[in-house]
């Protein structure tokens, strides 16, 4: 939520962010969009405003992080929005339970934070198998730690249904040829 706080320092008008998302979606009609929001941001905007925005503009997939409890998540699911939950590599039981009770894909941390490995599930494939054994049949996408082609291969071999690549690509936004080359390099491993 630090990034959103910084963004709100620059512009505190949520409507401008929402207008930007709508414009981006209109300019890219063949692209699937997944929103990411912190629960506290939804509360700041007002739950009803956020739900109405998502439904009116067909933003039906949401990664929801920073949950205080299941209230907002459950309201979003009831409204027809697919809510995906983030599960840390060490398989925090509260996060696993939240993912089980959700209706979107699972966003699983691809690589552990130093010192935060569940000794019963030390490898990514073990984490994925554990989530499957708990009854999760929806896609499991891995992110946070996917930087190089070998990271994509590792996630694929572990049984991930897909990956998220963040900063590696975002850092190249001013160098389109390098950006395109990096995306191709990563996609070649899929």
Residue ranges and their predicted role:
Residues 1-34, 75-91, 121-142, 146-148, ...:
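Alpha-helix-loop-beta-strand connector modules within alpha/beta enzyme cores
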Residues 95-132, 172-174:
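Glycine/Thr-rich beta-alpha phosphate-binding loop at enzyme active sites
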Residues 36-41, 67, 86-88, 111-113, ...:
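Active-site beta-loop-alpha junctions enriched in small/polar residues
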Residues 21, 51, 73, 96, ...:
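Generic hydrophobic/aromatic pocket-lining and core-packing "Φ" positions
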Residues 17-55, 67-75:
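N-terminal active-site wall of soluble small-molecule enzyme domains
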Residues 57-71, 107-116, 156-179:
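Glycine-rich phosphate-binding active-site loops on the catalytic face of alpha/beta enzymes
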Residues 48, 91-101, 134, 142, ...:
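Catalytic cores of alpha/beta
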Residues 57-58, 79-80, 101-102, 136, ...:
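Short, structured coil segments at secondary-structure junctions
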């Amino acid at each position: 939520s630090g990034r959103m706080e910084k963004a709100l320092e620059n512009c505190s008008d949520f409507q401008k962010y929402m207008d930007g998302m709508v414009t981006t979606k209109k300019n890219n009609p063949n692209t699937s969009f997944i929103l990411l929001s912190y629960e506290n941001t939804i509360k700041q905007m007002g739950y009803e405003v956020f739900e109405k925005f998502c439904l009116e503009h067909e933003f039906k997939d949401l990664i929801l992080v920073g949950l205080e409890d299941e209230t907002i998540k459950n309201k979003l699911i009831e409204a027809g929005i697919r809510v995906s939950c983030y599960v840390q590599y060490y398989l925090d039981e509260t996060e696993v339970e939240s993912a089980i009770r959700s209706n979107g894909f699972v966003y699983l941390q691809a690589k552990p934070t130093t010192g935060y490995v569940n000794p019963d599930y030390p490898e990514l494939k073990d984490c994925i198998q554990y989530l499957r054994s708990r009854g999760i049949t929806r896609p499991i996408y891995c992110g946070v730690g996917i930087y190089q082609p070998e990271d994509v291969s590792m996630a694929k071999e572990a049984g991930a249904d897909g990956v998220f690549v963040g900063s590696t690509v975002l850092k190249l936004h001013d160098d389109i040829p390098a950006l395109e080359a990096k995306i191709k390099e990563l996609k070649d491993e899929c």
